[in-house]
Amino acid sequence: MKKDIRVGDTLIGGTAPITIQSMCNTPTEDVDATMEQIRRLEDAGCEIIRLTVPDENAVEGFREIKRRTRIPVVADIHFDYRMAIAAIDAGADKIRINPGNIGGEENVRAVVRKAAECHVPIRVGVNGGSLERDILARYGRVTARGLAESALRNVALLEKFDFDDIVISLKSSDVKINFDAYRIVNEESDYPLHIGVTEAGTPARGKIKSAAGIGALLLEGIGSTMRVSLTADPVEEIHFAKALLTSLGIREEGIQVVSCPTCGRTQVKLEKIAEEVERRAGKLMESGFAGKGIKLAVMGCAVNGPGEAREADYGVACGRGEGLLFAKGKTIKKVKEEDIAEELIRLVKNDRDS
């Protein structure tokens, strides 16, 4: 079991559930824009927010943001150790640093002293793009062992100053290297791991890489907190992270829609129906629907359709221009093809209201 780390009022590690994080892409000094994005992220289900703090203007913005919000806020620090100290003074619930790029042991000692004094945890965040020169020289390129060595070396530096309120991340944009590096550190350290695939890319490719990289780690029981990194609106990261956790059975929340791939037996426009069910289910969740771990099955024919539909909370098995609705394993009624999506979502809503 991993060590417990408290970030504001949120626990990471130990027996705590896996938390979902994101990072604002607004300038931190633009307080109003950043607060608007934080509110959207919170509404989507984000549990920890990270903000960049590159200079004094950002520090002052960070201070005001902390005054306005309750969600745990992490300060992301690079190069200038003084910004880490200033961010802690401004109320940071955690700081993220790469000890190797803030200017030597004395600077790290100063940051650690302030963090210990204020009971603020530190994430040691190592990336494939910023490995130490001696490690790159030893391995010739970015490797899993090199990433793990860098992370553990920097953790040891914090421990040298009697600091152990630590979270570790070691991210690569290469899914296999990323996976192997986390496995190494997971076996060699009891600090909680912040998992993700860095620079995953645009949503189309980034979601594939994140599903493979993060999903593989989660299936092995590795990871205490996670961020899906996408070149997109950060809110999209949260939606995908929640969907990933639900798909793996780690969280039971929201509405999960499953549908068959179709074949020559399909006699309805199943793709259109499934997309409409997903759209309506999404709208229902956005409206504050309180359902937990609901599964909807949209099936195209009589081969697997009735069985799959009965296994789901709600489902439809389609025939020629129509569908047979199921709820909680029981047959409900037949409906016309054009009414399937509406009637299926109505079943969900009616059960909730009954």
Where are these regions (language model features)?
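Glycine-rich, proline-tolerant flexible connector loops at the mouths of alpha/beta enzymes
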Residues: 25, 30-31, 42-65, 96-104, ...
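Hydrophobic faces of well-ordered beta-strands that scaffold small-molecule active sites
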Residues: 18-24, 49-51, 73-77, 95-97, ...
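Catalytic alpha/beta core domains of metabolic enzymes, predominantly
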Residues: 127-130, 135-281, 289
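Hydrophobic or amphipathic alpha-helical targeting/insertion segments
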Residues: 82-123
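Active-site mouth loops of central-metabolism enzymes
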Residues: 15-33, 52-54, 71-79, 135-148, ...
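Alpha-helix-loop-beta-strand connector modules within alpha/beta enzyme cores
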Residues: 55-77, 110-122, 182-193, 280-281
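Glycine-rich phosphate-binding active-site loops on the catalytic face of alpha/beta enzymes
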Residues: 47, 91-105, 197, 220-234, ...
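N-terminal amphipathic alpha-helix/helix-capping segment at the start of soluble metabolic enzymes
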Residues: 1-22, 116, 279
